[in-house]
Amino acid sequence: MAAYTAIDDPEAYFQAEAYTGTGSTRTVTLSADTDMQPDVVWIKKRASNYNHNLFDSVRGVNKGMYVNNDAVEHDSNADGYLSAFSSDGFQVQAGSSTSDYVNVDGETYVAWCWKETADAGFDMVTYTGNETARTISHSLSAVPHFMTVRNRTATNDWLTYHHKNTAAPETDYLYLNLDSATQDQDIQWNDTAPTSSVFSVGTSGYTNGNTDGHIIYLWTGKQGYSKFGGYTGNGNADGAFIFCGFRPAFV
């Protein structure tokens, strides 16, 4: 294993966990063999059309963002929230009016959990926008393959970069929360590719809104653990086969 990848234990950096809500304080313990304190927890109620809720250790507990829409960062007290990150999981709490989003009694949920570390190719950066094209440092020590950024205080969509999106991906972007096709604007990434130490933003309110708080999540591929690529569909019932070099836990 070590000859193929430096990550011998992927469960130390990513785990997916299904759990059932209790309607009150609920400690969710990750069931894999390896203990992991997550830095990002993305929660979805499985049987209903409620929003995807994202929490992270940089913004802090009880600060949710919906991955599937453009709502601003919210205090989740009313609808249930993540109240703590633990050494091997997290804690969810019922809200003051309902617990629908994370912890309804008897309802099933899935949580995708990441550990922030350059070893596994994942970083988070918060910054304040200034509407001036510039570079911002990250800690991956490698070129990001995938980035998604969110203006925390404005009703903007999730601006997303993928290194295989087009021949010149730094000139283009996708929306994580919309089904729109690829778009081209230099005001998003300033038409500048990210490097092993910085990423670029332009003058857009999506990536660099003046005085607005932003958070960006950055990943780079790690052989045997994560991969960010593209494929061409073939229209066949069996579909196209996409080789990752490992069995993925999250697609």
Regions found by a protein language model. Give the residues of each.
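Surface-exposed molecular-recognition determinants
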Residues: M1-F250
